[in-house]
């Protein structure tokens, strides 16, 4: 393996105190060789240098790599292309001399590395994404953008034109209310009748409010109109007549004074009938006198007889 070769090549590179401290056995035969990867134009050289640097940092108590590195530039990414073998070799040499290959290559972390970088122009290059993100951030944050964001948006936008939002994020333009609302007058044409046509139609309307099918065909052929136009004219004329009659009725009701309501009907009273003579009942004395013939009216005696009246002189 290439790592074993580097360890056996230069023994003076690693201090003996560190190499043999703690009874650590780091013989080359104890290491398991990793699987070989296909050649990607200098990528295996960088991987071997990184493995050697990790081994060196594990054995020596030297200072570790810094936690954060500066943001890589777009020009530095060209070293990972197939044509960047020279830059990778320089990074390996820098790592063998005690430096950090990652710092020499100029990237902060392995996550920032893009192994499938294409140098030629591609229609779906990820460089177009920051323009959409910058436009979205400007929409969420209404404050003035910083100079760095403005410069990045102008640099990444194609043709030097600044794009605030992506096409699929743009809000559709609202049409004006006048263009959305349509009336019948604008959609359909309006027929203008001549004086002769109106006169003949008025004559027919006064003769009959509802025209027959036969008369409608004859009138349409005479006036040079279609049957549909004649039918619609009669419909409009009847609506106009109803409107005129309603207006006249309202005017008459306003001119006449309001009449008081009639009194409610009273229930019928019973009428008195014709007077009839009722016979008076007879007294007991008169009935007795009437029953005795030749008797003189008088008073009954104690014996039950009739007392004759006495005449005094």
UniProtKB/Swiss-Prot annotation:
- Region Disordered: start-end pairs: 242-313
Composition skew (Pro residues), residue ranges = 257-273
Task: Tell whether rRNA-binding is among the UniProt keywords.
Answer: no
Recorded family membership: Belongs to the Caudal homeobox family.
Record text on subunit structure and interactions: Can bind DNA as a monomer or homodimer.
Functionally, this protein is described as follows: Transcription factor which regulates the transcription of multiple genes expressed in the intestinal epithelium. Binds to the promoter of the intestinal sucrase-isomaltase SI and activates SI transcription. Binds to the DNA sequence 5'-ATAAAAACTTAT-3' in the promoter region of VDR and activates VDR transcription. Binds to and activates transcription of LPH. Activates transcription of CLDN2 and intestinal mucin MUC2. Binds to the 5'-AATTTTTTACAACACCT-3' DNA sequence in the promoter region of CA1 and activates CA1 transcription.
Q: What is this protein called?
A: Homeobox protein CDX-2
Organism of this sequence: Homo sapiens
What gene name does this entry carry?
Answer: CDX2
């Amino acid at each position: 393996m290439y790592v074993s070769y580097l360890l056996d090549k230069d023994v003076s590179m690693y201090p003996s105190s560190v190499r043999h401290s703690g009874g650590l056995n780091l013989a080359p035969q104890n290491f398991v060789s990793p699987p070989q990867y296909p050649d990607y134009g200098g990528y295996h050289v960088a991987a071997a240098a990184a493995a050697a640097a990790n081994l060196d940092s594990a054995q020596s108590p030297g200072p570790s790599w810094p936690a954060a590195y500066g943001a890589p530039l777009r020009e530095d990414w060209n070293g990972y292309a197939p044509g960047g073998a020279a830059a990778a070799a320089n990074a390996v040499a820098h790592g063998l001399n005690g430096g950090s290959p990652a710092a020499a290559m100029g990237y902060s972390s392995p996550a920032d590395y893009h192994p499938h970088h294409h140098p030629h122009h591609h229609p779906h290059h990820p460089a177009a994404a920051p323009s959409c993100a910058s436009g979205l951030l400007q929409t969420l944050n209404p404050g003035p953008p910083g100079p760095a964001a403005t410069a990045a948006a102008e640099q990444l936008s194609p043709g030097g034109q600044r794009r605030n939002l992506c096409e699929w994020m743009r809000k559709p333009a609202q049409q004006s209310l006048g263009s959305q609302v349509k009336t019948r007058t604008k959609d359909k044409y309006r027929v203008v009748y001549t004086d002769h046509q109106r006169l003949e139609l008025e004559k027919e309307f006064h003769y009959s409010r509802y025209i027959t099918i036969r008369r409608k065909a004859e009138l349409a052929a005479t006036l040079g109109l279609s049957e549909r136009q004649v039918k619609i004219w009669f419909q409009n004329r009847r609506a106009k007549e109803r409107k005129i009659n309603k207006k006249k009725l309202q005017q008459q009701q306003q001119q006449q004074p309001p009449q008081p309501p009639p009194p409610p009907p009273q229930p019928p009273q019973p009428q008195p009938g014709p007077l009839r003579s009722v016979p008076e009942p007879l007294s007991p004395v008169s009935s007795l006198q009437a029953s005795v013939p030749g008797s003189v009216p008088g008073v009954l005696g104690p014996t039950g007889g009739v007392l004759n009246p006495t005449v005094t002189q």
